[in-house]
Curated annotation (Swiss-Prot):
GO terms for biological process: abscisic acid-activated signaling pathway; defense response. PROSITE patterns: PATHOGENESIS_BETVI (PS00451). Keywords: Allergen, Cytoplasm, Pathogenesis-related protein, Plant defense. The gene is BETV1B. This is Major pollen allergen Bet v 1-B. InterPro entries: Bet_v_I/MLP (IPR000916), Bet_v_I_allergen (IPR024949), Plant_def-hormone_signal (IPR050279), START-like_dom_sf (IPR023393).
Length: 160
């Protein structure tokens, strides 16, 4: 098994606390609402949302995958940090054992935020992750962020 790391940063005009609340803490209900073309639903299979919780993310018809299951590893409200692992489903395929993800949202002096994202791909056997595959995953995550950001800009009273 190999482990391939991919780190990226992206900025948002939304303040860190508000973005953490909307994108991370309430994302299970907000993201299917603002990006139904990407995610149909998110349901807790086990747990209450904290560490150890297992979530099932269902994708819309026509998507390359039907679902994935994720395990919440850490929710740090004080530092706007969230860690989770993708543990089952189509996105892992025959080549990945799991994907461990960490998102940390940092406030910027201008009132916006920076999302620092770390992904660790745990491969099966001697499989290697291709840069274009990791880039495609980053672009999908960025699209979800922009959908949430647009919603928050249009609804200034939401998730404060």
């Amino acid at each position: 098994m190999g482990v391939f790391n991919y780190e990226t940063e992206t900025t948002s005009v939304i303040p860190a606390a508000r973005l953490f609340k909307a994108f991370i803490l309430e994302g299970d209900t907000l993201i299917p609402k603002v990006a139904p073309q990407a995610i149909s639903s998110v349901e807790n299979i086990e747990g209450n949302g904290g560490p150890g919780t297992i979530k099932k993310i269902t994708f819309p018809e026509g998507s390359p995958f039907k679902y994935v299951k994720e395990r919440v590893d850490e929710v740090d409200h004080a530092n706007f940090k969230y860690s989770y692992s993708m543990i089952e489903g189509g996105a892992l395929g025959d080549t990945l054992e799991k994907i461990c993800n960490e998102i940390k949202i940092v406030a910027t002096p201008d009132g916006g935020s920076i999302l620092k994202i770390s992904n660790k791909y745990h491969t099966k056997g001697d499989h290697e992750m291709k840069a274009e595959h990791m880039k495609a995953i980053k672009e999908k995550g960025e699209a979800l962020l922009r959908a949430v950001e647009s919603y928050l800009l249009a609804h200034s009273d939401a998730y404060n």
